[in-house]
Amino acid sequence: MDQPAGGTGKLRASAGEDDSMELSTCQELLHRLRELEAENSALAQANENQRETYERCLDEVANHVVQALLNQKDLREECIKLKKRVFDLERQNQVLSALLQQKLQLTANSLPQIPLTPLQPPSERPTSPAPNVSEGPATSLPSGLCAGQREVCWEQQLRPGGPGPPATPPPALDALSPFLRKKAQILEVLRALEETDPLLLCSPATPWRPTGQGPGSPEPINGEPCGPPQPEPSPWAPYLLLGPGSLGALLHWERVLGGPGEEEGIRQPWASSRAPPSAQGPSSGPHCAPGSSSSSSSDEAGDPNEAPSPDTLLGALARKQLNLGQLLGDTETYLQAFLAGATGPLSGDQPGPGKPNSPDPGPPQVSKSKGLPKSAWGASTPEATRLGFGATSEGQGPLPFLSMFMGAGDAPLGSRPGHPHSSSQVKSKLQIGPPSPGDAQGPLLPSPARGLKFLKLPPASEKVPSPGGPQLSPQLPRSSRIPCRNSGSDGSPSPLLARRGLGGGELSPEGAQGLPGSPLPCSAMPDSAQLRPSQSTVSTALSPGPVVSPCFENILDLSRSTFRGSPPEPPPSPLQVPTYPQLTLEVPQTPEVLRSPGAPSPGLPESCPYSGPQEKSMDRAGSESPHASRRTPGGSSKKPGQGSGRRPGDPSHTPLRDRLAALGKLKTGPEGPLGPEKNGVPARSSAEKARALVRSGECAGDVPPSARPLEQPEAKGIFRGAVALGTSSLKQQEPGLTDPGARVYSSHSMGARVDLEPISPRSCLTKVELAKSRLAGALCPQMPRTPAKVPTSAPSLGKPKSPHSSPTKLPSKSPTKVVPRPVVPLGTKEPPKPDKVKGPPWADCGSTVGQPTSPVAGPADPSQGSEGPAPHSAIEEKVMKGIEENVLRLQGQERTPGSEAKHRNTSSIASWFGLKKSKLPALNRRTEATKNKDGAGGGSPLRKEVKTEARKLEAESLNISKLMAKAEDLRRALEEEKAYLSRARPRPGGPATVPSPGLGQAQGQLAGMYQGADTFMQQLLNRVDGKELPPKSWREPKPEYGDFQPVSTDPKSPWPACGPRNGLVGPLQGCGKPGKPSSEPGRREEMPSEDSLAEPVSTTHFTACGSLTRTLDSGIGTFPPPDHSSSGTPSKNLPKTKSLRLDPPPGAPPARPPGLTKVPRRAHTLEREVPGIEELLVSGRHPSMPAFPGLLTAPPGHRSHQTCPDDPCEDPGPPPPVQLAKNWTFPNTRTAGSSSDPFLCPPRQLEGLPRTPMALPVDRKQSVDPSRTSTPQGPAFGGSRTPSTSDMGEEGRVASGGAPGLETSESLSDSLYDSLSSCGSQG
């Protein structure tokens, strides 16, 4: 308008001269006015349109959030309803069991005449076992007969006219009550059904036979007093398993075995459970002895005998002529148990899951039907006591069943090796861990479907015995079990025992055991789990330690012998055993492993039988179960304990996951217990697990490792073991890329999990989540996902190598492993590096672990990567998919600018609401990653499409970037406020903390995380305040890193640079340094000297966590990322970044490790680039980042370097890194572009698949974002954290190439999400 004004003046001046001139001028001015008005209106319209678009995006995000919250609420309500229902049912069971008890007592009083007669007839009845019967049974039968007698009563009721002697009892039974008769009939029907149950039939009696052989263990439990008879009781273990749960089956078995003694033995075990102290010793000793041989034979012939078992049982019962009074008493107890469903399901389920199910299909069913009642019974006062909630002493009684279950399934393992004591101790440990849980465990072993159904109830009943609180907790897990069953469902369907162990067993054992643990510790379920593990550990560590070690080792050995033939690893096994015991579930899984290996029956007679079905189940599980077993072998090679631990981790995986997912409170409560287990990692992980039910698998994996560290006082050893495992896994992967590779990968996941958990709660969490996802997928991903993932695992072997996208995706998973592998992997990695040229991008995300594991780990990773997303509940997945689609739609509509659209798609929008803090966005990314992984090349095509779209919508993208810039300003204001609020803490923690993380990697990292976060905030505040010294300092260190990076590149030490990423986890970081030294010792040393790599990484990592938390606080603050795009350069960069992000979807799992890195970026960017990685990337691209002009300034030179990834010229830029060391934690993050670059190995890694995090200064700068994000998580954290680093990273990404950058961005988003989740979980 000035012109018009000026023009007007001119017009007036000219008016005097020439009116025509004036007119022309006026016309010109008017024309200009019109043009300006049109332009103004156009701008206003465009502004309005952009505002509308932005609002639409916000609305969409809000809708997604609301939808997710509503879904969460609905699920929570559903869980609550289910919990209430379970509680009500349990109460009903208790009431009914009480009534039944009263009735039985009345009937028993009325029919007390047959008290001892039946005992003697039983002796008579079993011709061969008669002596045995009379020996121990006579003594124990009075109390022990309850089980057998009950069965007899039922049998008699079922067939009142059965044998002549029973004729009297039948009348007595009839006299007992029509209720009993009905019960007997129901049991009969159930037995018949069970007999026809394919699952039960499938499970060979033989496996239980070994259990029977291991029954020595049952006896130790039943008559722990009877140390010598233990071998004898061992046979009874199956019977007890059957007997308590399905006395009918036991009876058939006994009769088949000729087991009056056996029957009695069963009864005795029952008696033991009923009157564990008195009946236990005598009954278990004598009857067990006969039962021992009988049991084996009966187990062998169990199936054939099963058909006649009802009649035979009735006949045997009739022969035995059990005392009617005893029968009534036993029946009462048995019915009580049946009603309670605690003992019944335990024993019944146990037999079912055990191979006795097949020999005793009917009885297991009966036991199952009883199981619930028994559980209720357990809930009922008498049975509850019996169940061994009160059952330490009782534990022997009910635990006999449980022990028998566990002994048959768990202790028999030890027993099989010929360690009756061990088996008994295993039981003991089982008892200790879950006296009640033992029962739950019993069901765990049982058929998955029934086991789950009954298990759910029995755990509930178990809960019932335990305080209401514990009951609820278990119930929640049960509820979650339903979803978990989907994931654990795998377990239930795929392998009878394997899945039973996982699906049913794990869930139930976790729940039941947890509950028993609850009863024992009377604490929350998590506590019970912890207690249980330690108890188990103690038990196993004690006498069973060695024996169990053989047991579990055998299991492990089976799996290992299959792969590694690690029979010599039994000593480590004890650790494993503790792990398994720690996860009572693991014990069932141990049988799984035993069965799964099948071939390896070294000292595992049962193992072989198990192996048959288990192997099938393993096959069923597909790669998952095998992965689980193989995982164990992989880990076991170097660290049998570790491998075993991993395996347990997997098993524990499900229960923990169930607990976490099912028990929202477990997030809080279990987290507390788990936190201790995991150095606080579990807490976060548990919360996150809870967040993603599917992730429950991951969570379980996470927790188990944590439990393991707790259990095994070799936490450090575990870390080392984890590293060793990682190494071992890597090695294994190298040798056996395909099966072992997958296995190794699984192992590695476990190892990574183990390492990560101990190392850095947050980084661990993210990585653990990945590991959890993998484990969940490998072990028991949630149904389809698991299969899909399993295939992913197989294809992933190739996938990681072939597509960068896939590798990128893999890195996510790999990163999880990366932490564990870094030390050994460094060496291994270097060799794999060459193999993994493609791995580099993948390695970018998980460069540290990526390369070594790349071939195998990659495939495994993909499966887990997909699993990671897959582990989310179907609803979650749907939500994620929906959000993803919406985001894509919005991007297509609003941000069609191709790359930007894509970048924002994955990165910006995701970062807006999801990437940054939203669980949903992260889920979206994960979904994308899953999709990309699912379609090996899918990721690339998507990216390409998005890119094309982005180009079209580039203009729009710029506008959106401007809008986003505004949003970022707002966010910055919020973040500044937050930063100021947290400034006090951060500043103190600042630089001093950095060395701490690098040095005290595990603890230092924790400390560093917090201090680092503070420092990060402080630095952010400084940045905001206009203090650019830190950026300069960061820049200074950068050159060093750059120098370091170039060296790295040559030897591929970048992977060692990845070590820094592992460095995220302090220990790994340290390892990473050592690894690097080999190729670039000097450089590495430089890095350490500066603390730049390890220290910054660890500190950054912590900072990232802290920042993440703050970022989470900022929440939508993620939107600002587009802000950076607002500048023309940023938008261009954004598209690339977007591509990177899109790539990252495949590398979404890698994103997790980057997540930590990303978190740092976000954390560092909080103020300037809180907008998100995109913003960071953009900012890196354009030094016009308002928040960090200094950083931006530094980035320009570095940018040029980044642009030239091969330019070691960055070394000039790196000189500032000297200071970087000071501010490494946060400064790196801030100086992302300039000083972080040293950590930015990613550019090079991205570009030069070598993925040498430190390849070149330039590379590093470029890589910093991607690599930092992915490969050198530690450094990535440090570097990525810095907004400058992010900016530089973006530039580096652009320079490196869209794909790597994209991958990195996505990885960052994903990893950011993970970090945020971890931070959120932790608080």
From Swiss-Prot:
Residues 743-1136 are annotated as: Mediates interaction with beta-tubulin and is required for microtubule bundle formation. A motif ((S/T)X(I/L)P motif 3) lies at residues 918-921. Residues 271-298, 799-817, 1302-1323 have a biased composition (Low complexity). Keywords: Coiled coil, Cytoplasm, Cytoskeleton, Microtubule, Phosphoprotein. One of its GO terms (cellular component) is centrosome. Residues 1-22, 113-142, 156-175, 204-238, 260-314, 341-714, 778-875, 892-948, 979-1003, 1027-1323 are annotated as: Disordered. Residues 22-109, 942-985 form a coiled coil. Pfam families: NCKAP5. Residues 162-172, 226-236, 353-364, 1143-1153 have a biased composition (Pro residues). The modification Phosphothreonine is found at residue 654. InterPro entries: NCKAP5_C (IPR032769), Nckap5l (IPR026163). Residues 1-135 are annotated as: Mediates interaction with CDK5RAP2 and is required for homodimerization and microtubule bundle formation. GO terms for biological process: microtubule bundle formation; microtubule depolymerization. A motif ((S/T)X(I/L)P motif 2) lies at residues 808-811. CDK1/Cyclin B-dependent phosphorylation mediates its dissociation from centrosomes during mitosis. The modification Phosphoserine is found at residues 436, 447, 466, 473, 489, 492, 494, 573, 760, 1184. It is found in: Cytoplasm, Cytoskeleton, Microtubule organizing center, Centrosome. Residues 647-660, 925-934, 1027-1041 have a biased composition (Basic and acidic residues). A motif ((S/T)X(I/L)P motif 1) lies at residues 480-483. Its main location: cytoplasm. Residues 531-542, 1097-1112, 1124-1136, 1225-1237, 1264-1273 have a biased composition (Polar residues). Homodimer. Interacts with CDK5RAP2. Interacts with MAPRE1. Interacts with beta-tubulin. Regulates microtubule organization and stabilization. Promotes microtubule growth and bundling formation and stabilizes microtubules by increasing intense acetylation of microtubules. Both tubulin-binding and homodimer formation are required for NCKAP5L-mediated microtubule bundle formation. This is Nck-associated protein 5-like. It comes from Mus musculus (Mouse). The gene is Nckap5l.
